[in-house]
């Protein structure tokens, strides 16, 4: 009986030991599972954070890429131009997509009547207009706030004094009837020619007539001579026996041509001004690289054949950016805009076109051309 109890006790002890061992194993397993789960959770959290970081980096990269590829802010401007070989390239600027290339939305308006473009600028219908230095100074003398921002060209023969076959010298102009648009460049050219031989406007019978009408009137025999610019001198030379007496080629630098901005847009949106200046110089590059296409575009706007348009080539000298920048500087001859302006001011008053001289300070701003040269020179 005692032996049976001892055996039973031994069995109970063994069972207890076995249970304890199993409990210990379960706890170890639980701890191991817990540790493994914790490690898994930590790994998952690390992976999630890494994924989120990668996604953030990718988003930043996409944003940077988008910033780099996104077009610059588009500026909307209105530009007026008229019939002159130095301004016809603006039609190329438009048709070649150069305005869009630089970030401009441009309403480009062609004026068959040059004076109408000047008037449109004066009443605030335009942000920019193409004008001669004479007419810009006249506008400023009248109180308009304008700034010259581009030197397009110099007239080197496309402004002409044309006379009938009986007149062969400037001295012979005394007493003759001569038509030109009053107060503008060909009137100015005429006066310079007269003064070169000691004559004045009082020595002739001057008729102030719009350029297109003056050319047609001369061709019909209404005047002895006429002062006209391209393309209108083609009409004047239709008169039998007529010939050029002198031209802007005889007075280098006397007639510079420009893109003129309102003072308001220069002050309030210089970025738009810079874009337009950039567009102009990109256009000059385009003319060199695509001469045939460009010539066809310009001849179409000029309402003439390509052959006739080629006749204007030597009479207008387009300025490179470097040449334009030099013209903005000081000088002691007509290669300097400042010097030429000093010649024009008394003419405007003496001809009765303005009551007072135009203020020169602030009229010329070569900084936009200088910026182009610094970036592309």
Where are the language model's segments positioned?
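C-terminal motif of bacterial Sec signal peptides marking the signal peptidase cleavage site
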Residues: 18-21
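Short, glycine-/small- and polar/acidic-enriched structural segments
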Residues: 67-210, 224-230, 246, 253
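Secondary-structure end/capping motifs
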Residues: 267-353
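Conserved C-terminal helix/tail region of periplasmic/extracytoplasmic solute-binding proteins
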Residues: 341-377
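Bacterial N-terminal signal peptides that target proteins for export
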Residues: 1-9
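Pocket-lining segment of extracytoplasmic ligand-binding domains
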Residues: 127, 134, 206-207, 212-302
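N-terminal low-complexity, Pro/Thr/Ser-rich intrinsically disordered segments
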Residues: 44-77
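Bacterial lipoprotein signal-peptidase II cleavage site
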Residues: 23-32
């Amino acid at each position: 009986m005692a032996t049976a109890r001892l055996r039973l006790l031994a069995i109970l002890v063994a069972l207890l030991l076995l249970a304890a061992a199993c409990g210990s194993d379960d706890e170890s397993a639980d701890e191991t599972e817990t540790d493994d789960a914790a490690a898994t959770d930590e790994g998952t959290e690390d992976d999630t954070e890494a994924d989120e970081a990668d996604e953030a980096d990718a988003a930043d990269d996409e944003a940077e890429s988008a910033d780099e590829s996104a077009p610059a802010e588009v500026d909307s401007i209105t530009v007026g131009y008229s019939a002159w070989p130095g301004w016809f390239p603006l039609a190329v600027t438009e048709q070649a997509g150069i305005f869009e290339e630089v970030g401009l939305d441009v309403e480009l308006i062609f004026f068959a009547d040059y004076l109408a473009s000047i008037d449109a600028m004066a009443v605030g219908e335009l942000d920019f207009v193409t004008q001669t230095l004479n007419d810009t100074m006249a506008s400023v003398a009248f109180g308009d706030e304008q700034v010259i921002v581009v030197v397009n060209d110099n007239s080197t023969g496309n402004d002409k004094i044309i006379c009938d076959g009986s007149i062969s010298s400037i001295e012979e102009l005394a007493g003759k009837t001569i038509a030109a648009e009053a107060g503008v460049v060909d009137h100015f050219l005429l006066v310079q020619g007269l003064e070169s031989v000691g004559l004045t406007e009082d020595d002739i019978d001057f008729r102030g007539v719009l350029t297109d009408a003056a050319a047609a009137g001369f061709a019909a025999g209404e005047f002895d001579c006429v002062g006209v610019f391209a393309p209108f001198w083609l009409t004047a030379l239709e008169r039998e026996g007529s010939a050029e007496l002198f031209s802007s080629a005889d007075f280098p630098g006397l007639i510079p041509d420009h893109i003129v901005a309102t003072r308001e847009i220069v002050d309030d949106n210089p970025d738009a001004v810079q874009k337009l200046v950039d567009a102009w110089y990109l256009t000059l590059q385009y003319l060199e690289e695509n001469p045939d296409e460009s010539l066809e575009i310009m001849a179409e706007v000029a309402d003439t054949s390509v052959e006739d348009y080629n006749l204007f080539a030597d009479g207008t000298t387009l300025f490179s950016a470097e040449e334009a920048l030099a013209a903005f500087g000081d000088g002691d001859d007509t290669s300097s805009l400042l010097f030429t302006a000093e010649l024009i001011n008394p003419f405007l008053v003496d001809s009765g076109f303005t009551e007072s001289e135009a203020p020169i300070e602030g009229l010329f701003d070569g900084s936009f051309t200088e910026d182009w040269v610094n970036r592309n020179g």
